[in-house]
Amino acid sequence: MDGQFEVRLDAPFYTDEHREWRDSLRRFIDDRLMPHVNQWDEAGEVPRAVHREVAEFGLTGLGFPEEFGGFSEGTDIFHFVIKAQELARMGAGGVATALSTHDIGLPPLIVAGSDEIKRRVAPAVLSGEKIIALAITEPGAGSDVAALRTRARREGDFFRVDGSKTFISGGMNADFVTAVVRTGADGARGLSLLLIERGTPGFSATPLPKQGWWASDTATLHFDNVAVPAANLIGAEGAGFALIMNNLNRERLMMAAGAIGAARACLQDAAEWARERETFGKRLVEHQVIRHKLVEMSRRIESGQAYLERTAARMQQGERCAADIAMLKVDATLTMEFCAREASQVLGGASYIRGCRVERIYREVRVNAIGGGSEEILRDLAARQLGFDTA
C-alpha cells in the first residue's frame, strides 16, 4: 500500500510488537484472502477451509486463553484495532464478519461458562473447525435488550426454549449459538445465556438475503420447544444482561475501527484513480474540486483515527467510556458513508461495477451504521451518559 494511506503506528499507543503484528497480518491477508474476497462475496459464504487456515495463522485465537488454542500473552486492545482495520482493507465486510463471529459469540462463554463447556466448545471454535454465533435481536426487540421475549422454561435437567431471533450474523452456518433467553421476570434481570447447538430438535434457521455483507450469512433462528441441557447455561440465571453489555462496548469499538479502515480504503482507491484518470486533457487530480474531495476524506479519516486510538487507550486502562464509544461509532460510520459516496463520485461508473472495492463498501455502509446500535440509539445513549437527559 502506498505509505500515504497507512495508519501511522506511532507511540504512545503502538510498539514494535504491534508493527510486526500488522506486517505479518497484512502479508497473510494480501496473499491468502484478498485475491478471493470477491469470489466469496458473490458465492455468499467463506469456505470452512478458509476458517481453518485463518485459525492456523493465529487470527481467530487473538485475545483468547492459550489453554483453549488462543493467544493473549503480550496482546492488548490495539492488536484488535489493527486486526479490524487490516481486515477492512479488503473492502469486504462480509468476509471479515464471517471470520469474526466468534469475537462476540465466544467471550461470554469464556468468562462465565462451565469448564466442561469451555473445553468442548472453545478449542473447536478457535481451531476453525466450528463456528459460533451470538443471538440477541428478536423480531420485536433489538437495541432494547431488556425487552427480549424468547423464553426458556426450566424442566428438570433441561430448559425448554421457545421464540425466535433475527438478523443473526453466522446464523445459518453456526454450530453453536450463544443465545439470550428470558428465564425470569420482565426486564434485564430476567435474562440468561444458553448455548444452543446446531441439530437440536426444534431448532431451525432461515436465511435473510441482504444488501451487503454477502459472504456472511444472516439468519432468523426459530426455537420450537427446544430442549437445551441445563449444563449449557452460561453463568448464573439472570446474569445474561450483564454478560452481553460487557461485550457490546468492545464490539462497537471494533466496528468503529473497521468503518474507519473501510473509509481509508475508499480514499486510497479514489486517490489512485484520480492520479491516473484523465478528463478534458488533464488528470482528475489536477481539478481542484477533486483534490478538495480527497482532502476532506482524509481530514475526516484522520480525525476519526485519533478519536479511535484515544478511546481504545482509555478502554485499555480500564475506563468504561461508554459515551465516547457511542459517539465514536456514530462518527466512524458517518465517515465511512461520506468517503464511500465521495470515492464513488471520483471513480464514476467504475464504482458501480461489481468487483470494485468501493462498490462493495458502498453497499455495506448501512449495516455498519445500524449494527451494534444505530446512530439514533447511540446518540441517545451518549446523551444519557453525559447527563444531557437531566434537568
Regions found by a protein language model. Name each.
Residues 141-144, 159:
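Hydrophobic, small-residue-rich alpha-helical packing segments that form membrane-like cores
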Residues 147, 199-229:
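Flexible, small-/acidic-enriched active-site or ligand-binding loops
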Residues 225-243:
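Long, acidic (Asp/Glu-rich), low-complexity accessory segments flanking structured domains
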Residues 74-75, 144-146, 170-175, 188-190, ...:
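Short glycine/proline-enriched turns and hinge-like loops at secondary-structure junctions
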Residues 158, 162-206:
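A short core secondary-structure module
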Residues 1-89, 100, 112-116, 124, ...:
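Alpha-helical interface subdomain recognition
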Residues 128-136:
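A short, Trp-centered hydrophobic/proline-enriched beta-strand micro-motif
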Residues 96-116, 142:
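N-terminal glycine-rich flavin-associated loop
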